[in-house]
C-alpha cells in the first residue's frame, strides 16, 4: 500500500452521505469508496445529510472515517478545497450534481479528470413512466430531462453507468461519449438452505417519481 504522501487524490461529490444499508445505489457508492480508499486519498462532499437524523448521520460519517476519508457535509467551499488539493479525478453522482460543479473544477483544476456516475439514466426512467401513463406532459418532461442530461454528459471526460444496457442507450443517443460500466458490488452470500424458491421482490425507492 502506498504512503499517504504518494497516494493520488480523488474527489467524490454526492447528494448525501451514503446510506449503504438502506439503498442499492448508496451501497454501490460505499463499495466504490472502500475500493478506491485502499490506494487513494479521498475527499467526500455531501450536499446534505441523510435526512435520517443525527444518530444515523453520525453512523454513516463514522463508516467513512474508518476508511480514512475526509468528509464534508453541506458547509464546505469547493473553491477552497480545489485550491488546496490537486485531484487526479472528480467523481460526481447524478448529472444534476455534476452540472453544478463541473465549471469550477475545469477552471481551477483543468488537469482533473471529470467523471459523472449516472447511477441510472434519468430520461430513460422518465420515459418508462410515460409508457405507463401515456400522458403527453410526461413525454415532455422526458424530452427536457434528456436534453439537460446529455448536455452535462458531453462536458465529462468519462461517464459511468451501472449496466451495459444503459451504456448502449447512451452510445446510441450521444455517440462519442467515453463510457464505462461499474455494476452494483455485493459480497456473495449463500442461502442457509436451498428450498427451490426463485421469487424475488424488489421495492423501488419512492423518492423517484417514476417508481
Regions found by a protein language model. Give the residues of each.
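Carbohydrate-associated surface elements
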Residues: 165, 182-185, 196
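A short, active-site helix/loop in glycosyltransferases that binds the activated sugar's phosphate group
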Residues: 99-101, 150-178
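Active-site proximal beta-strand in glycosyltransferases
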Residues: 108-126
